[in-house]
Amino acid sequence: MPNPSPRYISNLTRDTYALILAGGRGSRLHELTDWRAKPALYFGGKFRIIDFPLSNCINSGIKRIGVVTQYKSHSLIRHLVRGWGHFRKELGESVEILPASQRSSGNWYEGTADAVFQNIDIIRDEIPKYVMILSGDHIYSMDYANILAHHVESGAKMTVSCMPVPIEEAAGAFGVMSVDEDYRILGFEEKPENPTPLPNDPTRCLASMGNYVFDTEFLFEHLKHDAQNEGSERDFGKDIIPSIIKDHPVFAYPFSNDDGEVSYWRDVGTLDSFWLANMELVSPKPPLNLYDKKWPIWTYQEQLPPAKFVWEEYNRCGAAIDSVVSGGCIISGATVRKSLCFSNVHVHSYSEIEESVLLPDVEIKRNCKIKKAIIDRGCIVPEGTVIGHNHDEDRARGFRVTNKGVVLVTREMLGLKVGI
């Protein structure tokens, strides 16, 4: 397909309403999501996961957005109000928060399709030609205008963004599809234990990214039909897509960069994947460029002083090497290597931090040694604590240790007051 004109793209994005599904817990993240929804989880030194699909919308020119919330949504809603509440409805801009409120029945959101169905009246009031359904819990940068143009030019009623994923990663985790030579979807399974491999690559399969484009009236018709089906689980992957691919044009859209290569996309749904995706950012040329001025990631920014590194004495030098250190941090006579320090982190003298993710407001007292760990927001790690060097001792103290050796520490595990 030739490159569409800017005016054509502008018309498409103006005619589109984006609905971001941000109500999930992310149970595979264990205690890290005990007090927050997965889309509210911190990422990349200063952002939250929800900032990525929201920024993609704004950068793509889509400025009518709804965010569906449900599980422990207070911190997510607070972030949205503070960071995304500046849009002006009279200019055709809005980020609306849509909490589960039993709008069309006596039930809360029962699945991804039901979350959209219960907000049909709100979507209809916007009079869009197209509706984008977006997952609120993945990390990636994507120009949604391209998938919109592909959707219209292909004559699809529904388009599913996809990318090749290793079989072992997709098993039980992603929707998997099979397509013909034109990328029309022939089969779709939601989170199969034995995914169907690609014809030309038995090690990978074609996985859904959880992002969909619909013709609006087609979406409404099939949501209403699904709502009347007592056997439905009210889910796009389990019910809607399998029910429409036989009789309607439903196409896959491969997510790739300008060179045709597979683009960056991370599902940070486990502690290991969350840790690894953050660790990728400390490399000299990370796969995700957070410094791209042409595609900025927007977020709420608290007014904080600059990061500070103090003390230069023998065995007591405040330094950070191959690390990301955010505003308000103080590295006082400590060494931080290959780590991310979110805002307001304070690491005291003689402590050593390596390959770790320190979420906001963490304080590491003196003489601590921490390696390959995730320290949750607000943790105060006592003086002399050693984490990540002996996993048997870590488990004995109540810390969670993953199969790949990442140690999670939360306030409850340290006996501190709990909150979001």
Curated annotation (Swiss-Prot):
The keyword Isomerase does not apply. One of its GO terms (biological process) is glycogen biosynthetic process. Keywords: ATP-binding, Carbohydrate metabolism, Glycogen biosynthesis, Glycogen metabolism, Nucleotide-binding, Nucleotidyltransferase, Transferase. It catalyses: alpha-D-glucose 1-phosphate + ATP + H(+) = ADP-alpha-D-glucose + diphosphate. SUPFAM superfamilies: Nucleotide-diphospho-sugar transferases, Trimeric LpxA-like enzymes. Pathway: Glycan biosynthesis; glycogen biosynthesis. Its EC number is 2.7.7.27. One of its GO terms (molecular function) is glucose-1-phosphate adenylyltransferase activity. Alpha-D-glucose 1-phosphate binds at Y109, G175, E190, K191, S208. HAMAP family: GlgC (MF_00624). Involved in the biosynthesis of ADP-glucose, a building block required for the elongation reactions to produce glycogen. Catalyzes the reaction between ATP and alpha-D-glucose 1-phosphate (G1P) to produce pyrophosphate and ADP-Glc. This is Glucose-1-phosphate adenylyltransferase 2. It comes from Pseudoalteromonas atlantica (strain T6c / ATCC BAA-1087).
